[in-house]
Amino acid sequence: MGTVNVVNVAKKHQFSWYEKFYFWSIGKGLWITLKHFVKVAFFNKQVTIEYPDKKRQYSTRFRGMHSMKRDEQGRERCTACFCCMWICPANAIHIEAAEVTAERQHLHPEDKYAKKFEINLLRCIFCGLCEEACPKGAIYLDGTGEMAADNREDLFLTKERMMEKTGGPILGQRN
């Protein structure tokens, strides 16, 4: 067997003087800090909002808390088709379906309804895919952004907490 010549192709990168001492990165960070300092100190631009006293203004396109809408007759729009659950990239939605009985027929437009509908806000990334996937327009991400909670159980939204009140405004389309 013959010998094999091995060639080492790895090169060591030679850092320049400012890369060696990280002056460039430190200077960029200090420049950003100095810009914020000048805005706040000399131009009186507030960065922080005093939350309980002042409320933040949200855009009309803001995706906030989840809500479930009713149709024009006050019935639940959700028909437990599982589209929102399947499309959720964070697996934050859990639905259990049930058949509509004769005594509940006035509450649901279809033959199937969501017996249990939960959204785990600890997992939700508020991407809005559930809203886009819903063929009935049952789930919306409305503009309310106050989601502070004292315990983990408050961050699990149930159907009862999300459902629009009977006789409330019917929101059909997002502007």
UniProtKB/Swiss-Prot annotation:
Enzyme class: translocase
Record InterPro entries: 4Fe4S_Fe-S-bd (IPR017896), 4Fe4S_Fe_S_CS (IPR017900), NADH_quinone_OxRdtase_chainI (IPR010226)
Cellular component terms (Gene Ontology): plasma membrane
Cofactor(s), by name: [4Fe-4S] cluster
Residues noted as binding [4Fe-4S] cluster 1 in the record, renumbered to the chain: 78, 81, 84, 134
Residues where [4Fe-4S] cluster 2 binds: 88, 124, 127, 130
GO-annotated molecular function: 4 iron, 4 sulfur cluster binding; iron ion binding; NADH:ubiquinone reductase (non-electrogenic) activity; quinone binding
Residue ranges constituting the 4Fe-4S ferredoxin-type domain according to the UniProt record: 69-98, 115-144
Catalysed transformations (reactions): a quinone + NADH + 5 H(+)(in) = a quinol + NAD(+) + 4 H(+)(out)
SUPFAM superfamilies, per database record: 4Fe-4S ferredoxins (SSF54862)
GO biological process: aerobic respiration
Cofactor, free-text remark: Binds 2 [4Fe-4S] clusters per subunit.
Membrane topology, record value: Peripheral membrane protein
Compartments it resides in: Cell inner membrane
Family, similarity comment: Belongs to the complex I 23 kDa subunit family.
Assembly mode: NDH-1 is composed of 14 different subunits. Subunits NuoA, H, J, K, L, M, N constitute the membrane sector of the complex.
Job of this protein: NDH-1 shuttles electrons from NADH, via FMN and iron-sulfur (Fe-S) centers, to quinones in the respiratory chain. The immediate electron acceptor for the enzyme in this species is believed to be ubiquinone. Couples the redox reaction to proton translocation (for every two electrons transferred, four hydrogen ions are translocated across the cytoplasmic membrane), and thus conserves the redox energy in a proton gradient.
UniProt name for this protein: NADH-quinone oxidoreductase subunit I
Organism of provenance: Leptospira biflexa serovar Patoc (strain Patoc 1 / ATCC 23582 / Paris)
